[in-house]
Amino acid sequence: NLSLMDENGFIPADGLINANQQIKAMRAQQEAASKKAITSNGWTWLGPGNIGGRVRSVVIHPTNTNIMWAGSVTGGIWKTTNGGASWAIMDDFMTNMAVSTMVIDPTNPEVLYAGTGETGYYSDYGPPRGAGVFKTTNGGTTWTQLASTNTPDWYYVNRLAINPANPLILLAATDSGTW
């Protein structure tokens, strides 16, 4: 029996404490191992270093590799024009900054889409809820929410893809299905 409950349906306090200690130890071990792996494989950290959050998506301009956008679950969307030497926030006023996925229009690099909401992240407070899909037509300077994605079905957008044969077709994988 893997349950922590006793015969009366209660969970002993020390059982929860032990479980939390094990979780912290596993996370510390994973973090230490991942830092070793990155350094030993010759990767060089380029930033950004002045924000919090997890980068979940990086999009590279199709004809100028010095231009990139990074989507962070709690930090929003950032852009570099110098190959990552410096980054600038692009969406401080977007209604939701929980960016989990991004795509760039293959025919017009000024058009990008950002999906919001993060799944697979569990904490005492639950995963950061999104607000659907946002679009920019000016390289990220301004973003507009796609009105059709302003529903609970779009709280957690996992992946976006643009049909290469028809860039007007945007595909999305969410917690509630594929659209």
Residue ranges and their predicted role:
Residues 1-179:
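Extracellular glycan-interacting surfaces
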